Amino acid sequence: MTISTTALGGGATTATRKQVEAKYEEERQIQLQSRGMVEDIEITRNASFEQFAKDPWAAPKQVDVEIQRERLLQQAHHKIIIIGAGFGGLLFAVRLIQTGKFKADDIILVDSAAGFGGTWYWNRYPGLMCDTESYIYMPLLEETGYMPRNKYASGNEIREHAERIAEKYALSERAIFRTVVQSLDWEEEGKVWKIAGVKLGKNDECQQPFQLIADFPIMASGAFASPRVPNYPNIFDYKGKLFHTARWDYKYTGGSIENPKMSGLADKRVAIIGTGATAIQIVPQLAKNSRELFVFQRTPAAVDVRNNYPTDPARFKSEIQGDGPGWQRRRQINFNAFTCNEKTLPTDNKIGDGWTRMPSFSVLIGGPQSLEPDYIDQIRPIDMARQSEIRSRVHKLVESTAIADSLTPWYPGWCKRPCFHDEYLQSFNSSNVQLVDIRHDGISRFTPNGLVANGVEYELDAIILSTGYTVPVTRASPSGRANITVTGRRGVTMEEKWANGLATLHGVMTRDLPNLFFAGTSQAGACVNLTYALDQNAIHVAHILSEAVKRQPSDCTKLVIQPTHEGEEAWTMEILQRAAGFRGIAGCTPGYLNGYGMDASSLKPEEQMNMARLAAWGEGIASYVDALEGWRSEGQLEGVEMTFFA
């Protein structure tokens, strides 16, 4: 179907809208038919793909890291062990320390990386920036007194901020790096968790087993821990350079994250597979530095203006910090109000970016109006108008009509993470850049000299995989995402709880996995600004743990805490009552946000109910936080079962 790319301007008719919806469905069907042709490999579970998981940033001789690791491992029993040393893990640690009931010495952070930062440790590709305003994304700016250098900070600056937080709260010496947790097992007799895994040696080899004991483990390993690598036919026949964007090889490309002048590509034919939020930042850099660049695209990104600029210290002090103590949280709440499409919006849009001008993203993350039966019908015309502007922008910036047509996104704006960049689309005007549209046939196979797509062999010196991260559809629990086996009372595993009718209390703890806490989206709040959601989880867990410790009798040495059955079922009912707020995702083009096009209507009723129990809080992040703060203010720890042992 061919229709105007500018369809749905201000005076769009119902007929035009139906045309656009038909075009959306046509593109969706094309995507559904091409999906599933290539299996995704979890690289940590497949020895043939281990090269894509190795750490390129770990120094060959990190003596200080090794000494610190061995010292902490020798202290086998720790009060709190946090799995993950990104912003999630750091926020849990900081909020626990701020209660006054825990010290840094009570806490250990364990991570497979060789430093702090989580996804910002691993990702160091050229052009990397956050796509949410740094003044609200980078946590604890008030506490650290730090001013980001730009409205959208670079990846390097964000990683350095993680290190800054660790230093301020005396956590730098409380991390066990290059250590992979593989299992958590509850020991009923000792009322502790046994944590087992392996220490990584040089080049991630020489793996040695370890075991730790924790009173209270916290799982904060994040959703983007493992690079996603499609198992293309004959992928290992390829003799050129092959790497994933999350393991960028500057030794091959030249340059660095601080200086993306990649002189090593000046005489190279380079391919990048994927055009999501990562690729749109990399493509302009590759276009400037490669002899030839081939961009393999299945689904076009919807790319709006980013408009990054340096932070003006005077303005930052007067307009942003000038709002007084608590300015960062108020700014975050202001952002959330617009992105969740609150019924009554603030009079002042403090951020004023592409996110806050996209109320339709609330279809994905939830909001107060999402629960209204006709909300999708209300928001669809607004989203169609925005997507029309996005499509028009493509044709304004891209000189070739044919290339612009291929770069034009035909799907609702909430179906893919929206992108923001000021150079990506213009890159396709360069004579050395070629777009390869693979939405029909995909990549059929690799060859020794390149790959075959659409029946054409492309000879390539390097192939870069910008294929995202493993987000398991069937292993959606925190343990599944982290590839950790968690076994609680009576042999109950976390995976079983998520698969067979999840119930939690507030999305941070679940019965039969006592003393264990976690971060995630199931039965918790969701928002664009991930660090805000993580912080709310951390604040809540810190409250629960500190209040429980306060109530522990002086003659008791052990505390066991878990939700009551009634408490977690009551919370789950609150989730189910709001699950319909996410119904708009079902008709999207396939991707990780909708289980790669999974048809829920084909499932049995009990399977559909189990899926609904996995949903986030559908009324928006503000409502979720209000529910948690109201619960805390009552001071009863309602729905929590505490048992004390001498």
From Swiss-Prot:
Topology of this chain in the membrane: Single-pass membrane protein
InterPro entries tied to this protein: FAD-binding_Monooxygenases (IPR050775), FAD/NAD-bd_sf (IPR036188), Flavin_mOase-like (IPR020946)
Key words, A-Z: FAD, Flavoprotein, Glycoprotein, Membrane, Monooxygenase, NADP, Oxidoreductase, Transmembrane, Transmembrane helix
GO cellular component assignments: membrane
Disulfide bond entries: none
Residues the entry annotates as binding NADP(+): 129-131, 275-281, 298-299
Amino-acid positions noted as binding FAD in the UniProt annotation, renumbered to this chain: 119-122, 131-132, 137
EC code(s) of this entry: 1.14.13.-
Cofactor note: Binds 1 FAD per subunit.
UniProt keyword Glycosyltransferase present: no
Catalytic activities: preaustinoid A + AH2 + O2 = preaustinoid A1 + A + H2O
Subcellular location: Membrane
Transmembrane stretches, start-end: 80-97
Domain of life of the source: Eukaryota
Pathway field: Secondary metabolite biosynthesis; terpenoid biosynthesis
UniProt-annotated site: Transition state stabilizer, residues: 417
Alphabetized GO MF terms: flavin adenine dinucleotide binding; monooxygenase activity; N,N-dimethylaniline monooxygenase activity; NADP binding
Cofactor(s) named in the record: FAD
Annotated glycosylation sites: 46, 429, 483, 529
Protein family per UniProt: Belongs to the FAD-binding monooxygenase family.
Function statement: FAD-binding monooxygenase; part of the gene cluster that mediates the biosynthesis of paraherquonin, a meroterpenoid with a unique, highly congested hexacyclic molecular architecture. The first step of the pathway is the synthesis of 3,5-dimethylorsellinic acid (DMOA) by the polyketide synthase prhL.
The protein, known as: FAD-binding monooxygenase prhK
Protein's organism: Penicillium brasilianum
Lineage: Eukaryota, Fungi, Dikarya, Ascomycota, Pezizomycotina
